[in-house]
Structure formats: C-alpha cells, structure tokens
C-alpha cells in the first residue's frame, strides 16, 4: 500500500494538497500516481500567475512509461512552481510529498476543499482500483 499522509487532502485524480502557513496550497502527485507512472523524465510546469479552475489540467508529468496530465484540485492562481523539477524531475519519484511538489496555488474558493478526499477516503479509493 502506498504512503498516504493523514494531514493532506487528495483528489480522485491522485493529486495531493497541503495548506501552508501563508494560506497557499502546495500541490503534487501521490506516491501511488508516481508508482504507476514510473521514472519521471520531465515535468511541464504551469505558468506562475495563471488562473485555473478546479479540474483544469495545468501541468504534465512525463515518465519513461507515459505522459499524464496533472489537474488543479482547487480553483485559484498559480503563485509558485517547483523549478527544481526542471533539472531533477526524479524528485517526483523519490520525494512525492516533499521535494517533488509541483506547484503552489492561492485558492479562490476554499469551499472546493470539501469535495477533496481525506487520507481514509483516498486509501479506500486505492483499494477499489
């Protein structure tokens, strides 16, 4: 079973979301998602300043197996991207919940968080796959 940190929120598309002290949210893909994709070779990051809606594809993770869209779990403005992934996309594999984060977003509608899964619900989703 993949590591599913209890303090994070999850989307059904295997993104995770963590609230930061400054009120922004950090987004990445789950350990389960990176295991399915395999070794990352490139991450196409969103543009800082871009406005996205929940469910929009806003980044792409390319691995040796496939390219997979990464979706915005909430609506808002992209305020930061993980530039380290340009040189080290493998961080998504080795540190999916730490150094392998993809982008940070300033949520425009925090009520959208209610539609995300907690760790228990995400683990149940994984068991059904």
From Swiss-Prot:
The keyword Hydrolase appears for this protein: no
GO biological process: glycine decarboxylation via glycine cleavage system
Alphabetical list of Pfam families matching this protein: GCV_H
Residue stretches making up the Lipoyl-binding domain: 24-106
GO cellular component annotations of the record: cytosol; glycine cleavage complex
Cofactor: (R)-lipoate
Modified residues (N6-lipoyllysine): 65
Stretches that traverse the bilayer: none
Record's cofactor remark: Binds 1 lipoyl cofactor covalently.
UniProt xrefs under PROSITE patterns: BIOTINYL_LIPOYL, LIPOYL
Entry keyword set: Lipoyl
InterPro entries: 2-oxoA_DH_lipoyl-BS (IPR003016), Biotin_lipoyl (IPR000089), GCV_H (IPR002930), GCV_H/Fam206 (IPR033753), GCV_H_sub (IPR017453), Single_hybrid_motif (IPR011053)
Keyword Iron-sulfur set for record: no
PANTHER family found in the cross-reference section: GLYCINE CLEAVAGE SYSTEM H PROTEIN, GLYCINE CLEAVAGE SYSTEM H PROTEIN-RELATED
Similarity comment: family membership: Belongs to the GcvH family.
Function in brief: The glycine cleavage system catalyzes the degradation of glycine. The H protein shuttles the methylamine group of glycine from the P protein to the T protein.
Subunit comment: The glycine cleavage system is composed of four proteins: P, T, L and H.
Protein name: Glycine cleavage system H protein
Lineage: Bacteria, Pseudomonadati, Pseudomonadota, Gammaproteobacteria, Enterobacterales
């Amino acid at each position: 079973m993949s590591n599913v940190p209890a303090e994070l929120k999850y989307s059904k598309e295997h993104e995770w979301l963590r609230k930061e002290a400054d009120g922004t949210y950090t987004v990445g893909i789950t350990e389960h998602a990176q295991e399915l994709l395999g070794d990352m070779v490139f991450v196409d990051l969103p543009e800082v300043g871009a406005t996205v809606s929940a469910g929009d594809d806003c980044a792409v993770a390319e691995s040796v197996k496939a390219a997979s869209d990464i979706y915005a779990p909430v609506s808002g403005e992209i305020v930061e991207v993980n530039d380290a992934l340009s040189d080290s996309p493998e961080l998504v594999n080795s540190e999916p919940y730490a150094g392998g984060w993809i982008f940070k977003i300033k949520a425009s509608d925090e009520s959208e968080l209610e539609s995300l899964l907690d760790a228990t619900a995400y683990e149940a989703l994984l068991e059904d796959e």
